[in-house]
């Protein structure tokens, strides 16, 4: 377990800053910079019975000699290690862990700029390796790290502008990058690449999407959004719509929804991009009721959540005929809003093309931009937990 001081930095006579205390139970000297080079500062705790405040006061005992610092918040707290070393797939999480992560995410929502909490990752470096395009995932991770006081190492397009373009193996890239950073966030075009990276690295690895495999942090923010918007996770009905064969977000989301009671999942997709059997088998073995349907209007009228996804052109290769056949079959528009429940929500991992019409955006049930914002808080929580613990 690591130890975190509850005492924030203070200023001596408005000039010199002394370091954070490692303990408040005894005196210890601290060397001061000019103009107090010949002095030392000693830390003494007040009796535990005294009311404590989150600051420190400095008393000059005389013009020369030691300066005594009285810490008005005594003691230390232990940070419990996070149960996971890496975040690779949805099946890693249980219900209790999800609840605890969401509690931390809610704390992240309240962090103010320039507060002590906004510096909890100061001194840490995050490396982002994105071999596929990203807007929300990459920027929200980088924003999360910086909002907690950390720094970011990045390459614009790891597939083209890293040594992968020269033929370097993923394992060699990971071994190199871990020497420069404290945590790696990686998106890759191959399913299973994140697991390979985690097996190679001696620092935490977060899967930011591995081809058609999984996207666990997206699923975390999705479930967090459902809980925030609907108010519950047990007893809900969710429609997963669109490209269910290639969409990694729906795969990870299905794994997480299976942790809750009395959940029903509807799969609505063109025949060529149906949900794969491994997810269906997992849901069945977990006791989750699921159903395939071709009628989005009927399903939407029953559901608390309509989770729309785009048909992924990049997964079809040269088969543009198959892509065009699948694209545009299921659209969320004003007509669909007309049959949806008043308290239901529409979600989308984004980016969208034409599968949600723009006139839906103004409806309060359109939750996808609120969903994207929640990604910041979930990723702040994960970075904090993986690097410093609970």
From Swiss-Prot:
Q: Where is the transit peptide?
A: 1-68
The main place the protein resides is plastid
Q: What InterPro entries would the database entry show?
A: Asp/Orn_carbamoyltranf_P-bd, Asp/Orn_carbamoylTrfase, Asp/Orn_carbamoylTrfase_sf, Asp_carbamoyltransf, Asp_carbamoyltransf_Asp/Orn-bd
Q: Which residues bind carbamoyl phosphate?
A: 136-137, 187, 215, 218, 350-351
Task: Name its cellular compartments.
Answer: Plastid, Chloroplast
A GO CC term? chloroplast stroma
Q: Which UniProt keywords apply?
A: Allosteric enzyme, Chloroplast, Plastid, Pyrimidine biosynthesis, Transferase, Transit peptide
Look up the record and give one Gene Ontology term from the biological process aspect.
Answer: cellular response to phosphate starvation
- Which positions in this protein are listed as binding L-aspartate? 166, 248, 310
Pathway, per UniProt?
Pyrimidine metabolism; UMP biosynthesis via de novo pathway; (S)-dihydroorotate from bicarbonate: step 2/3
UniProt record similarity statement: Belongs to the aspartate/ornithine carbamoyltransferase superfamily. ATCase family.
Give the protein's recorded name: Aspartate carbamoyltransferase, chloroplastic
Encoding gene (name): PYRB
């Amino acid at each position: 377990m690591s130890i975190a001081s509850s005492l924030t930095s203070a200023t001596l006579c408005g000039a010199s800053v002394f370091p954070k205390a490692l303990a408040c139970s005894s005196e210890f000297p601290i060397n001061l910079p000019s103009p107090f080079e010949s002095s030392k500062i000693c830390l003494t705790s007040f009796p535990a019975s005294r009311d404590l405040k989150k600051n420190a006061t400095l008393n000059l005992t005389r013009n020369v000699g030691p300066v005594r610092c009285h810490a008005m918040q005594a003691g230390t707290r232990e940070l419990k290690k996070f149960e996971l070393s890496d975040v690779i797939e949805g099946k890693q999480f249980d219900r209790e862990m999800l609840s605890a992560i969401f509690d931390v995410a809610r704390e992240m929502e309240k962090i103010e700029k320039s507060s002590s909490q906004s510096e909890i990752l100061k001194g840490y470096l995050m490396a982002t390796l994105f071999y596929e395009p990203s807007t929300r995932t990459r920027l929200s991770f980088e924003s999360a790290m910086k909002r907690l006081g950390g720094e970011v190492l990045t390459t614009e397009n790891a597939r083209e502008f890293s040594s992968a373009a020269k033929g370097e193996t993923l394992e060699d890239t990971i071994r190199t990058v871990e020497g420069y950073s404290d945590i790696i966030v990686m998106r890759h075009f191959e399913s299973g690449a994140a697991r390979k990276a985690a097996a190679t690295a001696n620092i935490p690895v977060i899967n930011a999407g591995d081809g058609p495999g999984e996207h666990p942090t997206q699923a975390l923010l999705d479930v967090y959004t459902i809980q925030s918007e609907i108010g519950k996770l047990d007893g809900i009905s969710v429609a997963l719509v669109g490209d269910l064969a290639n969409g990694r977000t729906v795969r990870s989301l299905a794994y997480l929804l299976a942790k809750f009671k009395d959940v029903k999942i509807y799969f609505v997709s063109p025949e060529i991009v149906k949900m794969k059997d491994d997810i269906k088998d997992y849901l069945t073995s977990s006791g989750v009721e699921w159903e395939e349907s071709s009628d989005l209007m009927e399903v939407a009228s029953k559901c608390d959540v309509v989770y729309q996804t785009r048909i992924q052109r990049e997964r079809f290769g040269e088969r543009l005929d198959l892509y065009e056949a699948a694209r545009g079959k299921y659209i969320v528009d004003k007509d669909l809003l007309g049959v949806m429940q008043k308290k239901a929500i529409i979600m989308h991992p984004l980016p969208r093309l034409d599968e949600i019409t723009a006139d839906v955006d103004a409806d309060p049930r359109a939750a996808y931009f609120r969903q994207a914002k929640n990604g910041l808080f979930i990723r702040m929580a994960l970075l904090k937990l993986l690097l410093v613990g609970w």
